[in-house]
A protein has these predicted regions:
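Structural preference for solvent-exposed beta-strand-turn elements
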Residues: 1-393
């Protein structure tokens, strides 16, 4: 009799389910990355919840990106959720996110009545939130699955980490706020530049369903949020689907949509010199920390300038401030060939590049005092970093 009464109660509701708090909190955290407080569409300040036979799906969206996170009913023989009455609702994102994080018990019950009021209970706590009509929530982009390829999760995370830092922080040239992806048969080349530095990463890809060369520019802000969501399960593949104005990343229980930037990305190949007057091989960490120490004084300068002198394996890193003084230190390069080097550069730009190279040693190419500095990991031709010097000598 009690079971019949419960069934009648659930049937009178627009949506009813129980869900594990940790799974709900994780999904909310993911979709919140796509929710913006500044939007011309008020309903997009909320999170859409949809309960059905495949579990609970949460959606967050703004003008640039949309994220769907699904909590399956069961996963690896563990029960995540039970849906008593399928349905959907849109709840205020900030309040719902804070509330879920602070709920006291391991399980959460969500019931939505026909007035779109959501009763959320956990332990002895009960919240009643006014929801919004889910039918008013915009549909997510439709991306044709024909144009797609796959890449390992850990590799995708590395690509983002090693390129997105070099995108432009200003909207003067909007296309430079994104990373240019050039997809060819079996390979992907990713390039970012803000006109003062450049990063380029090439990788092999799998299951490329389009043999034609494709070029698309993904907003740096979208890739930064994607990197935060990707976990460290490197063996899992990410399916990447492209259209004329959208890109979709699918992995695990996540679907991550991003709009693409309009405009033609500049041809960066002409910025990369093919010859050099000098080159050296140094310990990556040693050079990084030497520049870091020199930057303590360089930070007082508007351009954060550090000077490098190199001749016959003798390396000197220095900087100075009229108010504070001068710092310099010396160390030995593993290899050095070519003309003596005297060059200045932004400490931040050089550290940004070196800090994203995982190799123990880097090979640095010098072309001239005002020509680009090229940095590559020793033994890896798939990564190239470029930093423009600053005129001081």
């Amino acid at each position: 009799m009690q079971e019949t009464q419960n069934e009648n109660n659930h049937s009178a509701l627009k949506m009813s389910l129980n869900v594990q708090k940790d799974k709900l909190a994780e999904a909310v955290n993911h979709v919140m990355k796509a929710v913006s407080a500044k939007t011309t569409i008020p309903i997009l300040t909320g999170i859409k919840l949809t309960a059905g036979s495949d579990g609970l799906v949460l959606t967050g969206s703004n003008s640039d990106l949309s994220i769907k996170a699904r909590i399956p009913l069961t996963e690896e023989d563990e029960e995540n959720a039970v849906v008593h009455a399928p349905g959907s609702i849109v709840l205020p994102s900030r309040l719902f996110s804070e509330m879920v994080r602070k709920l006291p018990a391991a399980e959460v019950a969500i019931e939505v009545d026909t007035r779109l009021i959501a009763k959320i209970t956990s332990g002895q706590s009960e919240f009643n939130l006014n929801g919004l009509d889910p039918d008013e929530y915009p549909n997510l982009p439709v991306v044709d699955e024909k144009d797609a390829f796959s890449i390992r999760k850990d590799l995708l995370k590395d690509i983002i980490r090693q390129t997105v830092y070099a995108v432009s922080a200003t909207e003067t040239r909007p296309v430079l706020t994104g990373v240019n992806w050039i997809l060819k048969a079996g390979s992907l080349e990713c390039v970012a530049t803000d006109s003062h530095r450049l990063s380029q990463r090439s990788v092999n890809v799998e299951n490329n369903r389009n043999e034609e060369t494709r070029a698309l520019v993904i907003p740096g802000a979208s890739l930064t949020e994607l990197e935060k969501i990707i976990d460290d399960d490197g063996d899992q593949m990410v399916d990447i689907v492209m259209s004329s104005n959208q890109i979709l990343f699918k992995f695990g229980n996540i679907q991550f949509y991003s709009r693409l930037l309009d405009g033609k990305y500049p041809d960066t190949s002409r910025l990369i010199p093919t010859d050099s007057k000098s080159e050296m091989v140094v310990d990556t960490a040693q050079l990084y920390h030497s520049i870091d120490r020199a930057s303590l004084l360089a930070r007082e300068d508007r351009n954060n300038v550090v000077k490098l002198r190199a001749d016959n394996k003798n390396i000197e890193i220095s900087s100075q401030s009229l108010e504070l003084g001068r710092v310099f230190e010396t160390f030995q390069a593993d290899e050095f060939t070519g003309d003596p080097v005297r060059i200045s550069f932004s400490a931040k730009f050089m550290m940004d590049a070196l800090g994203r190279i995982d190799a123990e040693r880097v090979r640095i190419y010098f072309i001239g005092p005002m020509r680009p500095i090229i940095i590559r990991p020793v033994g890896d031709q798939q990564i190239l970093m470029l930093v423009l010097p600053i005129r001081t000598f």
